From Swiss-Prot:
Pathway, per record: Pyrimidine metabolism; dUMP biosynthesis; dUMP from dCTP (dUTP route): step 1/2
EC number: 3.5.4.13
Subunit structure: Homotrimer.
Protein name: dCTP deaminase
Keywords: Hydrolase, Nucleotide metabolism, Nucleotide-binding
Binding site for dCTP: R110, S111, S112, L113, A114, R115, D128, V136, L137, E138, Y171, K178, Q182
GO molecular function: dCTP deaminase activity; nucleotide binding
HAMAP family: dCTP_deaminase (MF_00146)
UniProt family annotation: Belongs to the dCTP deaminase family.
The protein's role, per its UniProt record: Catalyzes the deamination of dCTP to dUTP.
Keyword Hydrolase: yes
Reaction catalyzed: dCTP + H2O + H(+) = dUTP + NH4(+)
Stretches that traverse the bilayer: none
Length: 194
């Protein structure tokens, strides 16, 4: 069952779901809560790697990933990050999210941004039960013009569903959880897959 706005407010008030900083109640609508853009970004830098062999030896994949991803880019509160047509970038939500083991979250982009060609998440929009940390966004500009993205702008909306029970292996308790407690735009850690 997906939570409605009054349930989202109650779950936030009771500490069952936590968003830090907590959005005001006017950011909770129908069945979603707005989330804002943080100030941490990563981009693909100019590189000479012809490809990334996703099923190759872990050390090779790790070295290839390291060669193509930038260091973390932090921008000021009043600055803009420009995403050009055809570019992919990673960013984070301003809010850190904490979910219990019996609730799953979903991130959706905003229709108004999609109509300009901005995809907020390429495929990863599920927030696992037991998640704790900021949400990394996989931005892609499929439009024709560069887009100026600024910290604190509303970038998407979260919705929540109650599971049929408590997950036996929530994200926060898994030893192999690659993105546990992430607070910045963490690059792919596919080389850590088992």
């Amino acid at each position: 069952m997906r939570l409605c706005d009054t349930d989202i407010e109650r779950y936030l008030d009771d500490g069952i779901i936590a968003l830090t900083p907590r959005p005001s109640n006017d950011k909770i609508n129908g069945a979603t809560i707005d989330v804002r853009l943080g100030n941490s970004f990563r981009v693909f830098r100019e590189h000479s790697a012809p490809y990334i062999d996703l099923s190759g030896p872990k050390e090779q994949v790790s070295a290839q990933l390291e060669s193509v991803m930038s260091e973390e880019i932090l921008i000021g509160e009043n600055d803009a990050f420009f995403l050009h047509p055809g570019e992919l970038a990673l960013a984070t939500t301003l809010e850190s999210v904490k979910l219990p083991a019996n609730i799953i979250g979903w991130l959706d982009g905003r229709s108004s941004l999609a109509r300009l060609g901005l995809m907020v998440h390429v495929t990863a929009h599920r927030i696992d039960p037991g998640w704790e940390g900021r949400i990394v966004l996989e931005f892609f500009n499929s439009g024709k013009l560069p887009l100026a993205l600024r910290p604190n702008m509303v970038i998407g909306a979260l919705s929540f569903e109650i599971l049929s029970g408590y997950a036996a292996r929530p994200y926060s308790s898994r030893k192999n959880a690659k993105y546990k407690n992430q607070q910045s735009a963490v690059a792919s850690r596919i080389d850590e897959d088992k």
